[in-house]
UniProtKB/Swiss-Prot annotation:
This is RuvB-like helicase 1. GO terms for biological process: box C/D snoRNP assembly; chromatin remodeling; DNA repair; regulation of transcription by RNA polymerase II. GO terms for cellular component: Ino80 complex; NuA4 histone acetyltransferase complex; R2TP complex; Swr1 complex. Belongs to the RuvB family. Residues 1-11 have a biased composition (Polar residues). It comes from Mycosarcoma maydis.
Length: 488
């Protein structure tokens, strides 16, 4: 659901944190992603955009517009509409969509996709779109369960003669004693629960809970009374549970409609060898039928009416939406009007261009329907369009300063100014990409701070798109002069 691939070190803007080799192997160096510094839209209490807040710099009008859309989403008045972010490359369209998802919270599903993802040789384009639509719709299920919870003080399996095999024995039942702060209770459980206990590797001293209805067993951790037993142990110690052993517990589960589709489309097989081999051999990607989705929708509606579940519309972000064709746009029109639909955010960097899938064949080949942003007008009418503007020089400087802080680089003021000039002359993305190579060059020279010399050297080693185009043009002219065209 939503997406949080970065650790807390990078999100707080303190740079990558390298753990000592003596610490746990689970600790890893924090990965700095492209939008690690974005934590929200950076709006004040009255909805106006701050100059620089929550990792966002500039784009005040676009941020304020997204703030209004955010209020509409929270009030559930954005159904049947879509938000279109239109602007040049590197103007913060993806960052705006990510900021909206973070403002909504991690419990609201956020499903990003690119327009070219719909083209597959195995699945229809409309099926890929519907899958992503269902991924962006969450279902919060509240269920009251009867559970037995406590620390295991006794675990005794009772064996009995197996009438089907000669001298073999089988588990008849298992006796478990659970202890809490209030008291102890002894349980006599089914042998199938003993199999679950063996799979979880549960032993005396572990804190577990058993669901009374389903018989599911979950290991919570090791009792903290055993914390002094071993000096080196990768174990999670938990306190002794309070209250009675047998209690009622409210469990909240967050799933998406796509999870329900997959669970019903691919049910788990049996324990026989053919079922196991069938699960190992991955087949072709299959489509979920409309009939199955309709049945799931009916069950979901029933749960919502009974108050068991709550529908959580998430955000579907389609980047490079101009890559979709006419069939996909027609399908989007219908999907936006359906009763169960997420909030859709589209992004494109195209102006007037041809709608994909409308090219004519024959004498007029290469021509088709030209529309703003490469989107048909009937879908464009449903969109609230937000324009992103190119960054000014001061804003580029602030973004570079912020990224240097997040990535843990020390940079001199004159070097930052030189990098800002590169961002103005080429692009902000190219200037950001020069940060890490410049840092490595500075460390190679024995400096902890990036200087203007490192920026110049990195700029000579790596060229931007405009310089690359000029080099290719000059090479092309030289080749044309050196090798004349042959004439018959």
């Amino acid at each position: 659901m939503a997406t949080a691939n970065t650790s807390s070190g990078s999100m707080n803007g303190v740079g990558p944190v390298t753990m000592d080799s003596s610490t746990s192997g689970a600790s890893r160096e924090a990965r700095i992603a492209t939008h690690s510094h974005i934590k929200g839209l950076g709006l004040s209490d009255d909805g106006t955009a701050l100059p620089s807040a929550q990792g966002f710099v500039g784009q005040k009008a676009a941020r304020e517009a997204c703030g209004l859309v955010l209020d509409l989403i929270r009030m559930k008045k954005f159904a049947g509409k879509a938000l279109l972010l239109a602007g040049g490359p590197g103007t913060g369209k993806t960052a705006l969509a990510l900021a909206v998802s973070q403002e909504l919270g991690h419990k609201v599903p956020f499903c990003p996709m690119v327009g070219s993802e719909v083209y597959s040789s195995e699945v229809k384009k409309t099926e890929v779109l519907m899958e992503n639509f269902r991924r962006a719709i969450g279902l919060r299920v509240r269920e009251t369960k009867e559970v037995y919870e406590g620390e295991i003080t006794e675990l005794t399996p009772t064996e009995a003669e197996n009438p089907l095999s000669g001298y073999g024995k089988t588990i008849a039942h298992v006796v478990i004693a659970l202890k809490t702060v209030k008291g102890t209770k002894q349980l006599r459980l089914d042998p199938s629960i003993y199999e679950s206990i063996m799979k979880e590797r549960i032993s005396v001293g572990d804190v577990i809970y058993i669901e009374a209805n389903t018989g599911a067993v979950k290991r919570v951790g090791r009792s903290d009374a055993y914390a002094t037993e071993f000096d080196l142990e990768a174990e999670e110690y938990v306190p002794l549970p309070k209250g009675e052993v047998h209690k009622r517990k409210e469990v909240v589960q967050d799933v998406t409609l796509h999870d329900l589709d997959m669970a019903n489309a691919k049910p788990q097989g049996g324990q026989d060898i053919m079922s196991v081999v069938g699960q190992l051999v991955k087949g072709r990607r299959t489509e979920v039928t409309d009939k199955l989705r309709g049945e799931i929708n009916r069950v979901v509606d029933k749960y919502i009416e009974q108050g068991i579940a709550e529908l959580v519309p998430g955000v579907l972000f389609i980047d490079e939406v101009h890559m979709l064709d006419m069939e996909c746009f027609t399908y989007l029109n219908r999907a936006l009007e359906s009763t169960i639909s997420p909030h859709v955010i589209l992004a494109t960097n195209r102006g007037q261009c041809m709608v994909r899938g409308t090219e004519y064949e024959g004498p007029a080949s290469g021509t088709g329907i030209v529309a703003p942003h490469g989107i048909p007008l009937d879908l464009l009418d449903r969109c609230m369009i937000v324009r992103t503007m190119p960054y000014e020089k001061d804003e580029i400087r602030e973004v570079l300063r912020l990224r240097a802080k997040v990535e843990g680089h020390l940079i001199a003021e004159d070097a930052l100014e030189k990098l800002t000039e590169e961002g103005v002359s080429s692009s902000l993305r190219f200037a950001l990409q020069l940060l890490s190579p410049s840092s490595i060059l500075a460390k190679t020279a024995g400096r902890s701070e990036i200087t203007i010399k490192d920026i110049v050297e990195a700029n000579e080693l790596f060229i931007d798109a405009r310089r690359s185009a000029k080099v290719l043009m000059s090479i092309g002219e030289a080749t044309t002069e050196a090798v004349p065209m042959e004439t018959s």
